UniProtKB/Swiss-Prot annotation:
PTM: Prolines at the third position of the tripeptide repeating unit (G-X-Y) are hydroxylated in some or all of the chains.
Tissues in which the UniProt entry reports expression: Forms the fibrils of tendon, ligaments and bones. In bones, the fibrils are mineralized with calcium hydroxyapatite.
Bias type Basic and acidic residues, positions: 50-64, 859-873
Protein name: Collagen alpha-1(I) chain
Keyword terms, alphabetized: Calcium, Collagen, Extinct organism protein, Extracellular matrix, Hydroxylation, Phosphoprotein, Repeat, Secreted
Functional description taken from the UniProt entry: Type I collagen is a member of group I collagen (fibrillar forming collagen).
InterPro entries, sorted: Collagen, Collagen_Structural_Proteins
Top-level taxon in the UniProt lineage: Eukaryota
Biased composition (Pro residues): 154-166, 769-779, 808-823, 943-958
Native species: Macrauchenia sp
């Protein structure tokens, strides 16, 4: 609730009896006098010299030129490379600490100009620019060694459905019916007319699907635009608050100091001093802390596409690539529609069997009839003639692999092949385990005082003091008088000698007074014994990178890290020189007749043929594309000193100056009449809180801090940044002979086998009844040319063997030079050259007219000293003083857990290929592939002789 009214002032008590004369100890020396008011502030010193600009990023290292590849399709001009980022500008040095303000003296000398800050450190090295665009293709080099077989490309698209299969073979003849009774000899019948043609044959089985060839690779697409820079990620959560510190030991009791008196009215400013002479140039300040690197600039806008350049000379035709792997098996074609069944004809009268006519040509197979009911089993027929040998059946399943033969005597080593290219460096392995902590080193010498730290934020308010055990008596407030005018502060009196210490009061301890001013720093005490190792503090933020230290002595080799993952299989080495022939082995036993062998691998390429004739001159190419934007030019040389400047024109008249400072105090005026003593007015309302006082001058450097205790284990570090690009790997060691490979996967279906040889003719058997129709015979010699048949369905594409690549002809004569292309855009201007020395100063122009002096204000009469006002509200806590020198470093804490492994650094340049290893022993041959598709039906053989007449048929129905 609101404060109640003040009670009446109590009657003062009787004076106490004087106590016995005490002889107290001599009083402590008085507090030093308060600092006088701050003198007028000198003019600000000239600004410190800006740090030199950081070096521009060096251009990226040009990549090694790869072997000339085959002439590819003309690519779309790429966008211009992003220039390297310019180094960040170093920070200006931190100004030296400001000296303590001296007592107010007579007219203040103007302050010397501030020291120039030391030039900032060189900015970090710029990010190397992106790799430049490759130059125009050079002339065709000599034919390189055959490259390693490329990895299998993706499966080609499913080929179209193969052509319809060939008509199926004539089905086997049905079993012979029962032997009928021989009929009586009938009359010679009239030869009947030929019956109607049989119904159309059923569609043959679906042909095997054709092997679709791999489609040609598509043209490379145009490079996409660079993606927009992603938004900045959200700020991570704040770390957990550190543990609350232990309370410090209670400080020594401070000297008894009276409460500070009321703040005097600030006196009028003294007259401005004359401009002092320019001070000597100060020594350079300490090196500024390097600033953090700025954000990486976004990608530049895409340049305009250049016009087509002049076509270069046509390069030699590249070697024909190896055939790609067979595409996936196509889906089987749809079965053909069965033909419509013919209308059965009326049954004719059974005629007498006629004489057998000549064998007609085999008609197309009829449609499959409906399943008939099985007839009664007939008597066994006579043994038929030996049939013609059928086609060889499909290959049987692969037998169990034989036991591995003993390892042969190693042949003489082949000639050392040419050094292969450096293999690519493997990905950066995970960090090895942390080594054991080293022994604690000897304490180093005290470091130099650190830079003046930026004043920290105001600390939290201290804990309030504990109240006394017994509260003191509250005095009765007196009636408040009228507040008089505030007078000028009187001159400070001479401090009197300290009085004898009075007896200790009987009352309870009062509330602790406000904290006294900080005393002068005492002499540095001797180093105390090291305290116990404290708990390790939370790891602080990473400081700015310090300057590079001197290279240390080479340390002992650490323990070997864990073995890295097995690298990718290297490219096969060049084929070695053929070794000398080995000794002839013993003759082996004759082997059994083997199956027809699979198609052999294509032979080695033949000798290089003679060079072909020179090709005709190529056509005139279109104008070439606009050249790339030129790289920034080198830094210009330092310019020479310029000529002295001409005499400047007289300056314009200066502005009217501000009113001059107040003049000296005039003689004191006659004393005015004494006014009547006014009655005390009511107590005024409490005024608003005064604004916080100005920040006081920085305090003197604090004493050196105590030796810090080792901090606690820090939390796991954040994932490291990508490691630097790995160095080129060393040349590989000659590999050991490879182990025997595991059993390979089943091979792909082999090509169609060649037709087997014609079997020998069978022996003539006894003439029996006509046997069932045998399988189609092997194609006989070609008969006479028949009439031209209707065009058949398109066959599946054949696969011929790859021909040898002919030698590349010499490059054709260069075409006529094309029209000059348009002028490329102007390159970026080079870095600004170093500033030349300043030329001699020109003559000083005439001084402008001085403005009129402002009127001097009259000095007022000195007012009467008013009553002491109420104590103002406690001001804000002042800013922290200058940071004291850094204490001796604490004992190193235990090593925190290793941070998460950073992402793998960029892939290093390929290391040199090792010498080719020895040929390993051949693995176990894979199982035999499935049989190939059936070969095409051969041409019809010649018509055979007429067969013997068959037996008479059974009698017809009555």
């Amino acid at each position: 609730g609101p404060m109640g009214p003040s009670g009446p002032r109590g009657i003062p008590g009787p004076p106490g009896a004087p106590g016995p004369q005490g002889f107290g100890p001599p009083g402590e020396p008085g507090e030093p006098g308060a600092s006088g008011p701050m003198g007028p502030r000198g003019p600000p010193g000239p600004p410190g010299k800006n740090g030199d600009d950081g070096e521009a990023g060096k251009p990226g290292r040009p990549g090694e030129r790869g072997p000339p590849g085959p002439q590819g399709a003309r690519g779309i001009p790429g966008t211009a490379g992003i220039p390297g980022m310019k180094g960040h500008r170093g920070f200006s040095g931190i100004d030296g600490a400001k000296g303590d303000a001296g007592p107010a003296g007579p007219k203040g000398e103007p302050g010397s100009p501030g020291e120039n800050g030391a030039p900032g450190q060189m900015g970090p090295r710029g990010i190397p620019g992106e790799r430049g665009r490759p130059g125009a293709p050079g002339p065709a080099g000599a034919r390189g060694n055959d490259g390693a077989t490329g990895a299998a490309g993706p499966p080609g698209p499913t080929g179209p459905a193969g052509p319809p299969g060939f008509p199926g073979a004539v089905g086997a003849k049905g079993e012979a019916g029962p032997q009928g009774a021989r009929g009586s000899e009938g009359p010679q019948g009239v030869r009947g007319e030929p019956g109607p043609p049989g119904p159309a044959g059923a569609a043959g089985p679906a042909g095997n699907p054709g092997a679709g060839a791999n489609g040609a690779p598509g043209i490379a697409g145009a490079p996409g635009f660079p993606g927009a820079r992603g938004p900045s990620g959200p700020q991570g959560p704040s770390g957990p608050p550190g543990p609350k510190g232990n309370s410090g030991e209670p400080g020594a009791p401070g000297s008894k100091k009276g409460e500070p008196g009321p703040t005097g009215v600030q006196g009028p400013p003294g007259p401005a001093g004359e401009e002092g002479k320019r001070g000597a140039r100060g020594e350079p300040g300490p090196t500024g802390i390097p600033g953090p690197p700025g954000e990486r600039g976004g990608p530049g806008s895409r340049g305009f596409p250049g016009s087509d350049g002049v076509a270069g000379p046509k390069g030699p035709a590249g070697e024909r690539g190896a055939p790609g792997p067979a595409g996936p098996k196509g889906s089987p074609g749809e079965a053909g529609r069965p033909g419509e069944a013919g209308i059965p004809g009326a049954k004719g009268i059974t005629g007498s069997p006629g004489s057998p006519g000549p064998d007609g040509k085999t008609g197309p197979p009829g449609p499959a009839g409906q399943d008939g009911r099985p007839g009664p089993p007939g008597p066994p027929g006579a043994r038929g003639q030996a049939g013609v040998m059928g086609f060889p059946g499909p290959k049987g399943a692969a037998g169990e692999p034989g036991k591995a033969g003993e390892r042969g005597v190693p042949g003489p080593p082949g000639a050392v092949g040419p050094a292969g290219k450096d293999g690519e460096a493997g990905a950066q392995g995970p960090p090895g385990p942390a080594g054991p902590a080293g022994e604690r080193g000897e304490p180093g010498p005290a470091g130099s005082p650190g830079f003046q730290g930026i004043p920290g934020p105001a600390g939290p308010p201290g804990e309030s003091g504990k109240p006394g055990e017994v509260p003191g008596d509250i005095g009765a407030p007196g009636p408040s008088g009228a507040r008089g005018e505030r007078g000028f502060p009187g001159e400070r009196g001479v401090q009197g000698p300290p009085g004898p210490a009075g007896p200790r009061g009987a009352g309870a301890a009062g509330i602790p007074g406000p904290k006294g001013d900080r005393g002068d720093a005492g002499p540095k005490g001797a180093d105390g014994a090291p305290g116990k190792d404290g708990v390790r503090g939370i790891t602080g933020p990473i400081g700015p990178p310090g300057p590079a230290g001197a290279p240390g002595d080479k340390g002992e080799s650490g323990p070997s890290g864990p073995a890295g993952p097995t690298g990718a299989r290297g490219a096969p080495g060049d084929r070695g020189e053929p070794g000398p022939p080995g000794p002839a082995g013993f003759a082996g036993p004759p082997g059994a007749d083997g199956q027809p062998g699979a198609k052999g691998e294509p032979g080695d390429a033949g000798a290089k043929g003679d060079a072909g004739p020179a090709g005709p001159a190529g056509p005139t190419g279109p104008p070439g594309p606009i050249g790339n934007v030129g790289a920034p030019g080198p830094k210009g040389a330092r310019g020479s000193a310029g000529p002295p400047g001409a005499t400047g024109f007289p300056g314009a008249a200066g502005r009217v100056g501000p009113p001059g400072p107040a003049g000296n105090a005039g003689p004191p005026g006659p004393p005015g009449p004494v006014g009547k003593e006014g009655g005390k007015g009511p107590r005024g309302e409490t005024g608003p809180a005064g604004r916080p006082g100005e920040v006081g001058p920085p305090g003197p450097p604090g004493p050196a801090g105590e030796k810090g205790s080792p901090g606690a284990d820090g939390p796991a570090g954040a994932p490291g940044t990508p490691g630097p690009q790995g160095i080129a790997g060393q040349r590989g060691v000659v590999g050991i002979p490879g182990q025997r490979g595991e059993r390979g996967f089943p091979g792909i279906p082999g090509p169609s086998g060649e037709p087997g040889k014609q079997g020998p003719s069978g022996a003539s058997g006894e003439r029996g009844p006509p046997g069932p129709v045998g399988p189609p015979g092997i194609a006989g010699p070609p008969g006479e040319s028949g009439r031209e048949g209707a065009p058949g369905a398109e066959g599946s594409p054949g696969r011929g063997d790859r021909g040898e690549t002919g030698p590349a002809g010499p490059p054709g004569a260069p075409g006529a030079p094309g029209a000059p292309g348009p002028v490329g855009p102007a390159g970026k201007s080079g870095d600004r050259g170093e500033t030349g020395p300043a030329g001699p100063a020109g003559p000083i122009g005439p001084v402008g007219a001085r403005g009129p002096t402002g009127p001097q204000g009259p000095r007022g009469d000195k007012g009467e000293t008013g009553e002491q006002g109420d104590r103002g509200i406690k001001g804000h806590r002042g800013f922290s003083g200058i940071q004291g020198p850094t204490g001796p470093p604490g004992a190193p804490g235990e090593q925190g857990p290793s941070g998460a492994s950073g992402p793998a650094g960029p892939r290093g340049p390929p290391g040199s290929a090792g010498a080719p290893g020895k040929d390993g022993i051949n693995g176990i041959p894979g199982p035999i592939g499935p049989p190939g598709p059936r070969g095409r039906t051969g041409d019809a053989g010649p018509v055979g002789p007429p067969g013997p007449p068959g037996p008479p048929g059974p009698p017809g129905p009555p």
